[in-house]
Amino acid sequence: MLEPKKKMYDKSGPRVAAALQKRNMEAYYCPTAAEAVEKVLELIPAGDVVSWGGVATVDELGIKGRLRSRNQPVIDRDTARTPEERTAMLHQALTCDTFLMSSNAISEDGQLVNIDGIGNRVAALCFGPKQVIVVAGMNKVAADLDGAVSRARHIAAPANAQRFDGKTPCAVNGQCGDCTSPDCICSQMVITRFCKPAGRIKVVLVGEELGL
Protein backbone atom coordinates (compact mmCIF):
# COMPACT_ATOMS: atom_id res chain seq x y z
CA MET A 1 0.00 0.00 0.00
CA LEU A 2 1.24 3.50 -0.82
CA GLU A 3 2.32 5.49 2.23
CA PRO A 4 -0.11 8.41 1.67
CA LYS A 5 -3.07 6.02 1.66
CA LYS A 6 -1.80 4.33 4.83
CA LYS A 7 -1.52 7.73 6.52
CA MET A 8 -5.07 8.54 5.42
CA TYR A 9 -6.38 5.28 6.91
CA ASP A 10 -4.57 5.90 10.20
CA LYS A 11 -6.12 9.35 10.46
CA SER A 12 -9.67 8.44 9.43
CA GLY A 13 -9.90 5.00 11.08
CA PRO A 14 -10.29 6.22 14.68
CA ARG A 15 -12.96 8.68 13.53
CA VAL A 16 -14.99 5.91 11.88
CA ALA A 17 -14.57 3.77 15.01
CA ALA A 18 -15.97 6.63 17.10
CA ALA A 19 -18.98 6.88 14.76
CA LEU A 20 -19.64 3.15 15.18
CA GLN A 21 -19.43 3.52 18.96
CA LYS A 22 -22.10 6.22 18.86
CA ARG A 23 -24.36 3.60 17.29
CA ASN A 24 -23.97 1.22 20.26
CA MET A 25 -21.31 -0.96 18.63
CA GLU A 26 -17.95 -1.69 20.18
CA ALA A 27 -15.34 -0.53 17.70
CA TYR A 28 -11.58 -0.70 17.50
CA TYR A 29 -9.06 0.64 15.01
CA CYS A 30 -6.00 -1.53 14.42
CA PRO A 31 -3.30 -0.03 12.18
CA THR A 32 -2.05 -3.43 10.97
CA ALA A 33 -3.50 -6.82 10.09
CA ALA A 34 -1.36 -8.49 12.75
CA GLU A 35 -2.81 -6.22 15.45
CA ALA A 36 -6.32 -6.87 14.16
CA VAL A 37 -5.90 -10.64 14.43
CA GLU A 38 -4.77 -10.33 18.05
CA LYS A 39 -7.72 -8.04 18.84
CA VAL A 40 -10.21 -10.50 17.33
CA LEU A 41 -8.73 -13.40 19.30
CA GLU A 42 -8.81 -11.29 22.46
CA LEU A 43 -12.54 -10.65 21.96
CA ILE A 44 -13.39 -14.38 21.73
CA PRO A 45 -13.63 -16.22 25.07
CA ALA A 46 -11.83 -19.56 25.17
CA GLY A 47 -14.96 -21.69 25.43
CA ASP A 48 -17.05 -19.89 22.83
CA VAL A 49 -18.44 -21.85 19.89
CA VAL A 50 -17.41 -19.84 16.83
CA SER A 51 -18.76 -19.79 13.30
CA TRP A 52 -18.53 -17.46 10.32
CA GLY A 53 -20.02 -16.43 7.02
CA GLY A 54 -18.28 -16.89 3.68
CA VAL A 55 -15.78 -14.21 4.55
CA ALA A 56 -12.66 -13.48 2.49
CA THR A 57 -11.22 -11.10 5.10
CA VAL A 58 -11.18 -13.73 7.86
CA ASP A 59 -9.52 -16.19 5.46
CA GLU A 60 -6.98 -13.56 4.40
CA LEU A 61 -6.05 -12.87 8.03
CA GLY A 62 -5.66 -16.56 8.91
CA ILE A 63 -8.03 -16.27 11.87
CA LYS A 64 -9.61 -19.70 11.36
CA GLY A 65 -6.23 -21.40 11.67
CA ARG A 66 -5.43 -19.44 14.82
CA LEU A 67 -8.74 -20.51 16.36
CA ARG A 68 -8.08 -24.16 15.59
CA SER A 69 -4.56 -23.92 16.99
CA ARG A 70 -6.00 -22.95 20.36
CA ASN A 71 -8.65 -25.71 20.17
CA GLN A 72 -11.56 -23.30 19.82
CA PRO A 73 -14.90 -25.08 19.23
CA VAL A 74 -16.06 -24.14 15.72
CA ILE A 75 -18.95 -24.76 13.36
CA ASP A 76 -17.37 -24.94 9.89
CA ARG A 77 -19.83 -25.58 7.08
CA ASP A 78 -16.97 -26.42 4.73
CA THR A 79 -16.43 -29.66 6.66
CA ALA A 80 -19.95 -30.88 5.81
CA ARG A 81 -20.09 -34.14 3.88
CA THR A 82 -23.56 -33.67 2.40
CA PRO A 83 -25.74 -30.71 1.36
CA GLU A 84 -28.11 -31.58 4.21
CA GLU A 85 -25.30 -31.47 6.77
CA ARG A 86 -24.14 -28.13 5.37
CA THR A 87 -27.63 -26.67 5.73
CA ALA A 88 -27.83 -27.96 9.30
CA MET A 89 -24.52 -26.26 10.09
CA LEU A 90 -25.78 -22.98 8.65
CA HIS A 91 -28.70 -23.17 11.06
CA GLN A 92 -26.45 -24.11 13.99
CA ALA A 93 -24.27 -21.08 13.29
CA LEU A 94 -27.22 -18.81 14.04
CA THR A 95 -27.05 -19.84 17.70
CA CYS A 96 -23.27 -19.90 18.13
CA ASP A 97 -21.51 -17.77 20.74
CA THR A 98 -19.36 -15.73 18.36
CA PHE A 99 -20.05 -15.16 14.66
CA LEU A 100 -17.26 -13.77 12.48
CA MET A 101 -17.89 -11.76 9.33
CA SER A 102 -16.76 -8.74 7.42
CA SER A 103 -18.93 -5.97 6.02
CA ASN A 104 -19.45 -5.22 2.36
CA ALA A 105 -19.27 -1.53 3.18
CA ILE A 106 -19.25 0.89 6.11
CA SER A 107 -20.27 4.54 5.95
CA GLU A 108 -18.10 7.14 7.64
CA ASP A 109 -20.97 7.87 10.03
CA GLY A 110 -20.92 4.27 11.26
CA GLN A 111 -23.57 2.33 9.32
CA LEU A 112 -22.88 -1.20 8.09
CA VAL A 113 -24.13 -2.29 4.66
CA ASN A 114 -24.28 -5.97 3.77
CA ILE A 115 -25.65 -7.92 0.82
CA ASP A 116 -26.28 -11.65 1.06
CA GLY A 117 -27.38 -14.50 -1.18
CA ILE A 118 -29.30 -16.90 1.07
CA GLY A 119 -29.30 -14.54 4.05
CA ASN A 120 -27.47 -16.62 6.66
CA ARG A 121 -24.75 -14.01 7.20
CA VAL A 122 -27.06 -11.02 7.59
CA ALA A 123 -29.44 -13.11 9.72
CA ALA A 124 -26.62 -13.77 12.18
CA LEU A 125 -25.70 -10.09 12.15
CA CYS A 126 -29.25 -9.09 13.06
CA PHE A 127 -30.10 -11.74 15.67
CA GLY A 128 -28.95 -15.04 17.11
CA PRO A 129 -25.28 -15.34 18.05
CA LYS A 130 -24.31 -13.84 21.41
CA GLN A 131 -21.81 -11.58 19.69
CA VAL A 132 -20.87 -10.71 16.13
CA ILE A 133 -17.33 -9.61 15.30
CA VAL A 134 -17.03 -7.66 12.05
CA VAL A 135 -13.49 -7.39 10.69
CA ALA A 136 -13.07 -4.91 7.85
CA GLY A 137 -10.23 -3.23 6.02
CA MET A 138 -10.44 0.53 5.63
CA ASN A 139 -10.98 0.00 1.90
CA LYS A 140 -14.57 -0.91 2.85
CA VAL A 141 -15.29 2.60 4.19
CA ALA A 142 -17.38 4.97 2.05
CA ALA A 143 -18.08 8.66 2.59
CA ASP A 144 -21.80 8.24 3.30
CA LEU A 145 -24.63 5.70 3.27
CA ASP A 146 -25.33 6.12 -0.44
CA GLY A 147 -21.67 5.49 -1.15
CA ALA A 148 -21.67 2.43 1.09
CA VAL A 149 -24.71 0.96 -0.66
CA SER A 150 -23.08 1.66 -4.02
CA ARG A 151 -19.86 -0.01 -2.89
CA ALA A 152 -21.75 -3.09 -1.68
CA ARG A 153 -23.70 -3.42 -4.92
CA HIS A 154 -21.16 -2.35 -7.52
CA ILE A 155 -17.82 -3.44 -6.06
CA ALA A 156 -18.29 -6.13 -3.41
CA ALA A 157 -21.13 -8.05 -5.05
CA PRO A 158 -19.57 -8.36 -8.55
CA ALA A 159 -16.26 -9.40 -6.96
CA ASN A 160 -18.02 -12.02 -4.83
CA ALA A 161 -19.81 -13.31 -7.93
CA GLN A 162 -16.36 -14.02 -9.41
CA ARG A 163 -15.36 -15.75 -6.18
CA PHE A 164 -18.44 -17.98 -6.14
CA ASP A 165 -18.34 -18.57 -9.93
CA GLY A 166 -22.03 -17.75 -10.29
CA LYS A 167 -23.97 -17.36 -13.52
CA THR A 168 -24.99 -13.73 -13.16
CA PRO A 169 -24.48 -10.66 -15.35
CA CYS A 170 -21.85 -9.31 -12.95
CA ALA A 171 -19.98 -12.63 -13.06
CA VAL A 172 -19.81 -12.29 -16.85
CA ASN A 173 -18.93 -8.62 -17.29
CA GLY A 174 -17.93 -7.45 -13.81
CA GLN A 175 -20.78 -4.94 -13.51
CA CYS A 176 -24.01 -5.08 -11.52
CA GLY A 177 -26.96 -5.85 -13.79
CA ASP A 178 -29.60 -5.43 -11.06
CA CYS A 179 -30.49 -9.02 -11.90
CA THR A 180 -32.99 -11.54 -10.60
CA SER A 181 -31.16 -14.53 -12.07
CA PRO A 182 -31.30 -17.87 -10.19
CA ASP A 183 -27.67 -17.44 -9.06
CA CYS A 184 -28.21 -13.89 -7.79
CA ILE A 185 -26.15 -13.28 -4.63
CA CYS A 186 -27.97 -10.03 -3.81
CA SER A 187 -31.16 -11.42 -2.28
CA GLN A 188 -30.97 -9.45 0.96
CA MET A 189 -29.51 -6.02 1.65
CA VAL A 190 -29.27 -5.04 5.32
CA ILE A 191 -28.30 -1.66 6.72
CA THR A 192 -27.26 -1.79 10.37
CA ARG A 193 -27.61 1.70 11.82
CA PHE A 194 -27.77 0.82 15.54
CA CYS A 195 -26.86 -2.13 17.75
CA LYS A 196 -29.15 -3.72 20.34
CA PRO A 197 -28.19 -4.91 22.84
CA ALA A 198 -25.32 -2.49 23.19
CA GLY A 199 -21.95 -3.97 22.28
CA ARG A 200 -23.29 -7.18 20.72
CA ILE A 201 -21.73 -6.12 17.40
CA LYS A 202 -18.01 -5.49 17.63
CA VAL A 203 -16.23 -3.92 14.67
CA VAL A 204 -12.49 -4.24 14.16
CA LEU A 205 -11.32 -1.77 11.53
CA VAL A 206 -7.95 -2.51 9.96
CA GLY A 207 -5.66 0.11 8.45
CA GLU A 208 -5.00 -2.07 5.42
CA GLU A 209 -6.85 -3.15 2.28
CA LEU A 210 -8.53 -6.47 2.97
CA GLY A 211 -11.29 -8.55 1.41
CA LEU A 212 -13.47 -7.58 -1.52
Indicate where each model-derived feature is located.
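Conserved phosphate- and dinucleotide-binding cores of soluble alpha/beta proteins
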Residues: 94-212
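N-terminal start-of-chain detector that recognizes signal peptides
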Residues: 1-2, 21-24, 71-74, 85-87, ...
